[in-house]
Amino acid sequence: VYAVFDNHKFGDYNAYIYKSKNKGFTWQKISNNLPENTLLWRIAQDHINSNLLFLGTEFGVYFTNDGGKEWTKLNAGMPNISVRDIAIQKRENDLVLGTFGRGIYILDDYSALRTFNKIDKNSKLFSPRDSYWYKQKRILGGSKKASQGDNYFVADNPPFGVEFTYYLKDKILSKKKSREKEEKKFEKENKIIEIPDWKILESEKKEINPAIWIFIYSNNNIIRKVKADNKKGFNRINWDLSSESKSIISSKNFNKDESGYMVNPGEYSAQLLSLIHI
């Protein structure tokens, strides 16, 4: 059982959140590392992992997946505003936030947060939720509203296809970036920085930039390669349910990420890979 209180009408802006393991006979305060002077408004518990909690505060939303021992703020795309209400859409694993004066925010498929504290690897690809297979409608031969003008308002649909969530402990750096990072560290520590010889510089010049890819498989055969972002932390990328392009490789399309026909409905596997020049 969890309970959230506020006492701001008496000039007390501290965070009050309590947990009971014996149906309310005794209570334990679990505000722990929450910032000072942070009013709390709402708490919601995940329907699968009972230790995963979401906390609406006066300054954004926090989550914990260890029952309140440590709280982490959700920042990406979420402004520093008052979150007054929280709802969980169980079928889609979506987190819905009602704010004071700034509308509604939705975090699509938060299921990756259930195992966030268990990540001990340099990277991890999380299982996506099932996707819908359909052909997107093209109005007047174009996308969205085509040429119907600004008076015809339409909002963006969610990205089409399968949405992958993956985690990178650190951004993969090139040899040059790694060397420059090490040199900056030495400079701060007042250590001697050695000038790289021409072989090192030549190797850096010829190096292929590191890249992150997601390979899609069907019956152990690669049917599509999706280029992903090389960024630290949680990232998301979509596969549009298409196969690799069957076009003949030429100088015009060599660097283009062209797609082929749409794959059949079924089960597919995916693998997160990094391209590094050794």
Residue ranges and their predicted role:
Residues 277-278:
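Conserved small/polar residues in nucleotide/adenosyl-binding loops
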Residues 272-274:
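Conserved structural position at the C-terminal beta-strand
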